[in-house]
C-alpha cells in the first residue's frame, strides 16, 4: 500500500507543479517580493476557505477545495524557497531558476512525506478529510507563533518543518 501512496504523492505533486509552471509563465516569479509572514497568511487564507466550505458555506467563488489544496502545496514550496533566499524587491530570478528551486524543495518535501508515510504506517488513510484542514490550520498557527518569536524555538521544529508538513 505504501508504494501506491507514494505514487499518489507523486501524481498530486505533478499537478501542483504544472499549475505552478503555468502561473510562473503568467506572472513571473512575482512571489519573490513576498515576505515569509505574507506567505504564511496566504496559506492561512486558503486553509480558512477550505474549512468554510467544509462546514457547508455556499461557494460563491466557484473554485473547489482541491484548487485550494494545490495552492497550499505551492505556497508552502514557495515559502521554503523564500526562507533560503530571503525576499526581494523585484522578480529577480528567471522562470527556469524558479522551476529549479521549486523542484528541489518539492523533492525534499516528497521524500519527507514518503518517510513519514512509512513510519506512521499509512495512518493518513484512516483520517477524516476535515482533519487534514485542521492540521494545516494548526501548522499555520504554529508557524505564526514561531515567526513572532523571530524563528527561535526551545524544543520545536522550525518554520521550514511546518511548511513541509502543510
Q: Residue spans of the language-model regions?
A:
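Intrinsically disordered, low-complexity regulatory regions
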Residues: 1-165
